[in-house]
């Protein structure tokens, strides 16, 4: 089938930022100016097109990443608007994995905030080129210069302004384009749809010349011929500068910075121009590589071409009440059409694609065909999970999956009535399949079901969805910290599992050595030689170990960051079986951990508090009392920003305490930073409680 838009005229972008920086408002303006929506939807009215879930409209925040498509200057722009709240970081993670470029939105007053740093690191990890939009330039305390400085210092990036603001705060009226040398001011009556382009105002001439010189110097390095031309005193054309900025952005050597006020309808059209001019098309980025599932050492390149064999990544699952199971995927090579059979390379199972849908928030448009570079939703894949690769069965390939963050908070949940029991289990299983950062597990000791997630809001939304979408009523316990266990020194176990009770017995023998594996999770090494344990029993030993690690020996918390080396063992011709070696693995790891200095770990949160100067002492004292370690302080207009690392267990109820200490004038945000050893006295208390 013929392509409507050439691949090089397509952009797959994400809009990301800290909560309240104005991402969704910016996206709503983009939809308005590109003609997708004929009326501007506002977040504060609960009418934003991209925030379509009931909970999003009620709370004025983005929870899921919503996808939409618009056109600008004959280019197709696929946009994913992602959440800014730290509890929904998995939505950002999975979006960045499949996007080619990103727009990072910053609040001109607050600058770089904690979640801005998190999404920036996520974008770095996936090598995503980006441009920055300094939003809310009309607010009191807005500073373009300070924001650019924070992007440079806090994010260790190379921000290059390609615009200069005209005025600030309530005098902000437009931007000066450093590339074209034109001043752009926006008409309020037409909601910014019409704008005036004129010469640079005289009072900005010196600043314009200095900033333009800096910009050209930074980007001309990308092209030797242009650098020579520039050093020779020749003027570069607008096209040459745009080409240089584009090359430098795609190479991730610079980050172009623009500014505006989306809410006041200023600066959004130039931002769209920058998306088209500077961000890559699917063919501009490095070709996706995967591995052959049958020979993992064989790398397979997947060129962005419709004629190549299919390779696509499932990055999100969603249950639609009218359509059923939707699998969102990004096609890297080849094409998908309705009715075709595809291979799930992760499971080895074949499935038939029912229908293909292009999504616009929660509205959908049925299409028959999608090609390389497209992001589509598929109906009919029943077996796919987040992170699976679907491909042509003649060329199996597994693409790199997603990094799934570990949950830090859990609550006990139980059905309100017996009638709700089965429905609750089914609903939780469905939600866990949709959201890999949400986990469900049973506590054998208490017979309770525990649900774990990224924060209180995350679990609150899950419980809310149980009632609204699945009509299941549940009682929920108080939030608990998701502690972990680990080891502090190497250990060894020589374990025999022998059982004789008439008939065929059970025999398994394994010798394992374990050592701490900080930050690397679980690792299993098979060092068996000479067939002392047959090959078919190695996997059951590994499985027995992994299952035993789900419940640690101190307090039943999962054991993490441990390397296991299987070094020796023996078997019996008749009595050995997979089950016997599974039990042996489980017994051996418990024995080895007991000798390896097991300790408890607790989640440590990165906390930022912005407080008026007069409450600084109270806020600092309170953080110290919560076992907090202050990392830095920064003066703001009439306020102080304090960054500290505080154990999550000390942060329950902090919002209420902070409000009362500062008469509601201070704000805070927090996100997971790392796991750290629990102090001995506290660990003892926790072990006693669990015992």
Curated annotation (Swiss-Prot):
PROSITE patterns in alphabetical order: G_TR_1, G_TR_2
Binding sites annotated in the UniProt record for GTP: 17-24, 81-85, 135-138
Domain tr-type G residues, every copy: 8-283
Pfam families in alphabetical order: EF-G_D2, EFG_C, EFG_III, EFG_IV, GTP_EFTU
Gene3D superfamilies named in the record: 3.30.230.10, 3.30.70.240, Elongation Factor G (Translational Gtpase), domain 3 (3.30.70.870), P-loop containing nucleotide triphosphate hydrolases (3.40.50.300), Translation factors (2.40.30.10)
GO MF term (any one): GTPase activity
Alphabetical keyword list: Cytoplasm, Elongation factor, GTP-binding, Nucleotide-binding, Protein biosynthesis
GO cellular component, one term: cytoplasm
Cellular compartments annotated: Cytoplasm
GO annotation (BP), single: ribosome disassembly
Assigned protein family: Belongs to the TRAFAC class translation factor GTPase superfamily. Classic translation factor GTPase family. EF-G/EF-2 subfamily.
Its job: Catalyzes the GTP-dependent ribosomal translocation step during translation elongation. During this step, the ribosome changes from the pre-translocational (PRE) to the post-translocational (POST) state as the newly formed A-site-bound peptidyl-tRNA and P-site-bound deacylated tRNA move to the P and E sites, respectively. Catalyzes the coordinated movement of the two tRNA molecules, the mRNA and conformational changes in the ribosome.
Protein name per Swiss-Prot or TrEMBL: Elongation factor G
Species per Swiss-Prot/TrEMBL record: Nitratidesulfovibrio vulgaris (strain ATCC 29579 / DSM 644 / CCUG 34227 / NCIMB 8303 / VKM B-1760 / Hildenborough) (Desulfovibrio vulgaris)
């Amino acid at each position: 089938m013929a392509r409507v838009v050439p691949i090089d005229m397509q952009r797959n972008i994400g809009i990301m930022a800290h909560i309240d920086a104005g991402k969704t408002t910016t996206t709503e303006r983009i939809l308005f100016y590109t003609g997708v929506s004929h009326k501007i939807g506002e977040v504060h009215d609960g009418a934003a097109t991209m925030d379509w879930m009931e909970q999003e409209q009620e709370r004025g925040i983005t929870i899921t990443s919503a996808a939409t498509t618009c056109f600008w200057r004959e280019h197709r722009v696929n946009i994913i608007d992602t959440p800014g709240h730290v509890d929904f970081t998995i939505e950002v993670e999975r979006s960045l994995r499949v996007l080619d470029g990103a727009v990072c939105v910053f609040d001109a007053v607050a600058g770089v905030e904690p979640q801005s740093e998190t999404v920036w690191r996520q974008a770095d990890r996936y090598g995503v080129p980006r441009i920055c939009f300094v939003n809310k330039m009309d607010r009191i305390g807005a500073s373009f210069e300070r924001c650019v400085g924070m992007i440079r210092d806090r994010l260790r990036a190379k921000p290059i302004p390609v615009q200069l603001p005209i005025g600030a705060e309530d005098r902000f009226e437009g931007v000066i384009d450093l590339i074209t040398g034109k001043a752009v001011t926006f008409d309020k009556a037409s909601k910014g749809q019409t704008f005036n382009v004129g010469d640079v105002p005289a009072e900005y001439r010196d600043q314009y010349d200095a900033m333009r010189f800096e910009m050209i110097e930074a980007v001309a390095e990308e092209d030797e011929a242009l650098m020579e031309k520039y050093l020779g005193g020749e003027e570069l054309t607008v096209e040459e500068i745009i080409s240089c900025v584009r090359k430098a952005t795609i190479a991730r050597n610079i980050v172009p910075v623009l500014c505006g006020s989306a809410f006041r309808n200023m600066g959004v059209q130039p931002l769209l121009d920058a998306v088209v001019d500077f961000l890559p098309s699917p063919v501009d980025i490095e070709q996706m590589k995967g591995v052959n599932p049958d020979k993992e050492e064989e790398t397979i390149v997947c060129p962005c071409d419709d004629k190549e064999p299919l390779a696509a990544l499932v990055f999100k699952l969603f249950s639609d009440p009218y359509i059923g199971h939707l699998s969102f995927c990004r096609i890297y090579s080849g094409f998908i059409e309705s009715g075709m059979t595809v291979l799930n390379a992760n499971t080895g199972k074949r499935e038939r694609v029912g229908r293909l849908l292009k999504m616009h928030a929660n509205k959908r448009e049925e299409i028959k065909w999608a090609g390389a570079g497209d992001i589509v939703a598929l109906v009919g894949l029943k077996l796919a999970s987040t992170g699976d690769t679907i491909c042509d069965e003649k060329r199996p390939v597994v693409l790199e999956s997603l990094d799934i963050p570990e949950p830090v908070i859990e609550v006990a949940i139980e059905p309100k009535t017996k009638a709700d029991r089965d429905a609750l289990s089914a609903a939780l299983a469905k939600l866990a399949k949709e959201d890999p950062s949400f986990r469900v597990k049973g506590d054998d000791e208490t017979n309770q079901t525990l649900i774990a997630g990224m924060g209180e809001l995350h679990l609150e939304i899950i419980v809310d969805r149980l009632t609204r979408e699945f009509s299941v009523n549940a009682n929920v316990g108080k939030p608990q910290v998701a502690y972990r266990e680990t080891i502090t020194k190497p250990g060894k176990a020589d374990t025999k599992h022998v059982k004789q009770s008439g008939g065929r017995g059970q025999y398994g023998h394994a010798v394992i050595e374990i050592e701490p594996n900080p930050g690397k999770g679980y690792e299993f090494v098979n060092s068996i030689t000479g067939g002392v344990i047959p090959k078919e029993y190695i996997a059951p030993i590994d499985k027995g170990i992994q299952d035993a690690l789900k419940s640690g020996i101190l307090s039943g918390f999962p054991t993490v960051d441990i390397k296991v080396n299987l070094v020796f063992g023996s078997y019996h011709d008749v009595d050995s079986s997979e089950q016997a070696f599974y039990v042996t693995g489980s017994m051996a790891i418990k024995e080895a951990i007991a000798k390896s200095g097991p300790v408890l770990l607790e989640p440590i949160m990165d906390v930022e508090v912005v407080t008026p100067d007069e409450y600084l002492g109270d806020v600092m004292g309170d953080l110290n009392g919560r076992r907090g370690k202050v990392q830095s302080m920064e003066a703001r207009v009439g306020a102080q920003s304090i960054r500290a690392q505080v154990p999550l267990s000390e942060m329950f109820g902090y919002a209420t305490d902070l409000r009362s200490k500062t008469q509601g004038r201070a704000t805070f945000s927090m996100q997971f930073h790392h796991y750290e050893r629990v102090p001995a006295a506290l660990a003892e208390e926790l072990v006693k409680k669990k015992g």
